[in-house]
């Protein structure tokens, strides 16, 4: 038995997944902010011990990894939906112009990759640089 979806069902699946991804993004942004707060407080406190600095570094690196996973999962989700649109395009039902535009801007059936695109990579590198330099650089009097 072959499953046959209508375009509206595919769009609903896409937006349901993106809603869940939005909640995950709010968590990632919150934890990036917490990383900035940690690094700022460690920079301001010259007496912070090395264990706290290592823990804060680990926290910031984990949050950066979670952001990479979020970038990858949202792209993978969109590409999976584009794969469903590609199947629908070849069926009797056909595909609407909006579905065609979505399909043209996606890479159907592409595997999940943690490699960020350039703006995502620059964003994460900037955030990590600011956080880690604040944690490990000595405060200038």
Question: For the regions a protein language model found, what residue spans apply to each?
Answer:
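Cytosolic-side membrane-entry/anchor segment at the start of a transmembrane helix
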Residues: 1-36
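Hydrophobic alpha-helical transmembrane segments
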Residues: 19-20, 94-129
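Alpha-helical transmembrane segments
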Residues: 21, 25, 29-33, 51-68, 119-122, 129-130
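Transmembrane alpha-helical segments in integral membrane proteins
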Residues: 29-40, 113-141
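Amphipathic, cytosolic membrane-interfacial segments at TM-TM junctions
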Residues: 38-55
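Hydrophobic alpha-helical membrane-insertion segments
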Residues: 54-82
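Juxtamembrane non-transmembrane "cap" segments at the membrane-aqueous interface
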Residues: 73-101
């Amino acid at each position: 038995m072959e499953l046959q979806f209508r375009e509206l069902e595919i769009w609903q699946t896409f937006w349901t997944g993106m809603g869940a991804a939005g909640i995950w993004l709010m968590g990632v942004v919150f934890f990036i902010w917490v990383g900035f707060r940690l690094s700022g407080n460690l920079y301001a406190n010259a007496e912070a011990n090395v264990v706290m600095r290592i823990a804060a570094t680990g926290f910031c690196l984990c949050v950066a990894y979670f952001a990479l996973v979020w970038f990858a999962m949202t792209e993978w989700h969109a590409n999976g939906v584009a794969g469903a649109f590609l199947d629908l395009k070849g069926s009797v039902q056909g595909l609407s112009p909006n579905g065609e535009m979505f399909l043209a801007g996606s890479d159907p059936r592409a595997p999940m990759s943690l490699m960020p695109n350039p703006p995502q990579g620059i964003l994460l590198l900037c955030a990590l640089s600011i956080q880690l330099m604040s944690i490990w650089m000595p405060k200038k009097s």
